[in-house]
């Protein structure tokens, strides 16, 4: 509702002659992934029904407002973030913001309750916050700061998930969410399975449940790369192996030995089949790792670096890459960001 209200206010401001924009960067959203609506033309009903505009719909979870709500430390921080939200470009190339549009108050009214974390419970009665979750491939892929801080305040232990693999999810969790809110994780759990490792080892998806020591060994470098990346951030790492009923004991032992050789803790998780009881070994290893203590986060890059330098640091330190090549569209976007001169290049 807030996302589409903002889109309507932008179109209304243009229709009323309040602003002349050369580009509108804000799109509408809906909950159905309808590819026919990704790129459309609106305002075809004549002067009384708006200005013809090339636009489109994104899926709701991809809305920038979701990322803003999840990163906001409180209502005042939310207002500041909404004020500086860029929704379009004026004819002179400068940014047209939500504050300039005068839409912040209306959005605050809609998002005020959305800032409150949703408290639920597992089937075993364990309390949990389910709140937020912007996509990690286009945003930061973490739950809300409000939910994390609430969990840390009321519980002895707070566990949060960073979406996607550790190269994407953990990196953004550390470099964006933790850095912007002064959070210091005590340990990091890296989840894997024999099936996943065999798939990385080249086995076709229908065959990953079968015993295949060669494929497992071929997939282990992927796990070791993730471990090395997490250790570079200064984290105590616990590898949690999701257990399946037909897992081979010898293959599990190979993974265990590789983890111990890499200097990290290892435990088998049977939580899917046995609930909390099946995850006790993981919990014990996490508690032991926390006692040893992680170092203060060693971020992948400095905020003083240029955008290109930050991308290169993530590429080499996290993904193990060498050089970065940019598409023409990416280069145009970088040029726009720098031309706005709003300090974006100094953000995580």
Task: Give the location of each predicted region.
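Flexible phosphate-sensing "switch/lid" loops adjacent to ATP/NTP-binding sites
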Residues: 1-348
């Amino acid at each position: 509702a807030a996302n589409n209200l903002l889109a309507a206010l932008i179109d209304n401001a243009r229709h009323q002659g309040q602003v002349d924009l050369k580009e509108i960067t804000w799109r509408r959203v809906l909950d159905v992934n309808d590819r026919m609506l990704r790129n459309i033309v609106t305002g075809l009903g004549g002067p009384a029904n708006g200005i013809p505009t090339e636009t489109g719909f994104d899926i709701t979870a991809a809305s920038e407002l979701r990322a803003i709500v999840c990163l906001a430390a409180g209502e005042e921080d939310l207002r500041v973030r909404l004020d500086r939200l860029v929704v379009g470009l004026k004819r002179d190339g400068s940014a047209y913001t939500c504050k300039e549009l005068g839409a912040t108050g209306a959005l605050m009214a809609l998002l005020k309750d959305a800032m409150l974390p949703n408290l639920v419970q597992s089937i075993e009665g364990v309390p949990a916050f389910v709140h937020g979750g912007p996509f990690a491939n286009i945003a930061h892929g973490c739950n809300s700061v409000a939910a994390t801080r609430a969990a840390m305040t009321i519980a002895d232990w707070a566990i949060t998930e960073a979406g996607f693999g550790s190269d994407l999810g953990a990196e953004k969790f550390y470099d964006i969410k933790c850095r912007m809110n002064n959070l210091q994780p005590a340990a990091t759990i890296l989840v894997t399975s024999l099936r996943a490792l065999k798939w990385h080892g080249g086995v076709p998806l229908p065959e990953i449940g079968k015993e295949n020591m060669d494929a497992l060994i071929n997939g282990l470098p992927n796990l070791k790369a993730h471990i090395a990346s997490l250790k570079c951030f200064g984290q105590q790492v616990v590898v949690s192996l999701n257990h399946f009923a037909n897992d081979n004991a010898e293959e599990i032992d190979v993974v265990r030995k590789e983890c111990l050789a890499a200097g990290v803790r290892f435990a088998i998780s049977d939580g899917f089949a046995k609930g909390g009881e099946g995850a006790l070994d993981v919990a014990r290893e996490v508690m032991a790792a926390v006692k040893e203590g992680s170092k203060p986060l060693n971020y992948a890059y400095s905020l003083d670096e240029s955008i290109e330098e930050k991308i290169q640091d993530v590429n080499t330190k996290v993904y193990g890459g060498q050089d970065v090549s940019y598409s023409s569209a990416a280069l145009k976007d970088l040029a726009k960001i720098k031309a706005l001169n709003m300090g974006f290049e100094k953000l995580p």
